[in-house]
Structures are given as structure tokens and as C-alpha cells.
Amino acid sequence: MICYPIIMNNQLKFSYKYPSLEPGILIKRYKRFLADIELKSGGIITAHCPNTGPMTGVSTPGSNVMVSYSNNPKRKLAYTWELIEVTDNEPTWVGINTALPNRVIKLALAENLFPELGDYYEVKTEVVYGKDRKSRVDFKLISETKNIYLEVKNTTWADGRVALFPDTVTKRGQKHLRELIGVVEQGERAVCLFLINRGDCYQFAPGDVADHDYGKLLREAMIKGVEILPCRFIVTPQEINYLGIAEFIN
């Protein structure tokens, strides 16, 4: 997968290209990591499902899906499930591969895509931090002023036009918020970036129904200075394009 930054009208248009994807129909997802899919080209395959969550609203049998293929002989499953088409509002592709957002954001950070982050001159990944030094933040942006600790969350669940996170109880996510609060208390900047992996949502809100404690903690973190960036992306079988910041609904 490749990132192509394109200059248009003096603005940076960020586009992340998928490899060639093959269409199919989802038969079922099971054991979290497996999905049976009927390929449009014929035949039924078992694909790797790179998403450990409940995938609320984005794992409906009979839905159109897209898969990638790998000829790596060391892989147990040659196909990986990448996208699903939902019809909550209008037909919309959703990226379900949870390994992808960090790769997308890493490339976006290299292109200084988000002016909200200000100036930084180095991007570090998987940096140890936190009260007990046992946590790792997705990105640390080195700045001449305050360094930025940035955590990325893949967001696929939606209620109408509102993207929601999380879609299940996440103790790990709660811990990340506490660690980010600690970063602010130490005088640095902390950012939680929600990558909205579908183009039909214009707003973002905490998924209180799924994890009330996370929603409460997220609001507390914002009050204490943790910055929230709910980033809208439109997804197609060819590419992912950045659309801007979604409105946060408290």
C-alpha cells in the first residue's frame, strides 16, 4: 500500500492507495480472526479478519466486501479482509483492517497533513511512556516547544451520521486515556486521533452505550487538556482520502 501526497489548489490532498483488491460477498465472520467469503470470481475462501473487536454494524453476512491477496508461502491464509460496504445512510465502504490506520497516519504525519498539530521535526513510533513505563504510545512528535504524544484509534461504528468509539468495553483504551492525561500533567501535549474509517459520518461522539466509563474518561481527558482529533476519511476499493475534522458531539 502506498501513500501519494498530491498538491491541488495549494493544499495537500492526502491519498493512500490500496493494492489491487478482489470483490466478494461475506458469508460469515467467526472465531474473531476468520471470515468465509464468496469471491465474485468464483469459489469460497477463508480470509484473515484483521479486527479483534465486535465489528458492530460492519460484519453483516451478505454484504459486499473487498479482500487483498498475498502470495507469501509462510502465510496460513492468502487472503485478508480489507473493506465492507454498509448501507446505514447510503452505500459506503468501511475499512475494517485495524493494522492499517497507524500506517496511514504515519505517512500523513510525514506529510504534515494535520495543521492542528503545529510544527514538529521528527516522528517516533511505539515510544515507551506512562506512569509505570509499561505503555507504548503510537507516535511521539518531537517539537522545538512541547513534544506531542499521539494515540490512534480506528473508528468504524456509526449511528446515522455520527461515528462512535469504542464499540465495546476497552480497558486498554481507558488506560491510554489515563496515560495521555499524565502526559499533559507533565507539561507535554497529548492527542487522541480517531481515524473515522468511513466517509458517511460528519460528526463524532464517544460510544457511551458500549463503554460508559470510556466516554466519561474521554470527556475528563478533554477538560484536563488532552486534544481530540476525529479525522474523517472516505474509503473506496482504490484508496483512502482525507476529508478533514469531524464535529465532536459531547
From Swiss-Prot:
One of its GO terms (molecular function) is DNA binding. It comes from the Bacteria. InterPro entries: SfsA, SfsA_C, SfsA_N. HAMAP family: SfsA. Belongs to the SfsA family. This is Sugar fermentation stimulation protein homolog. It comes from Trichodesmium erythraeum (strain IMS101).
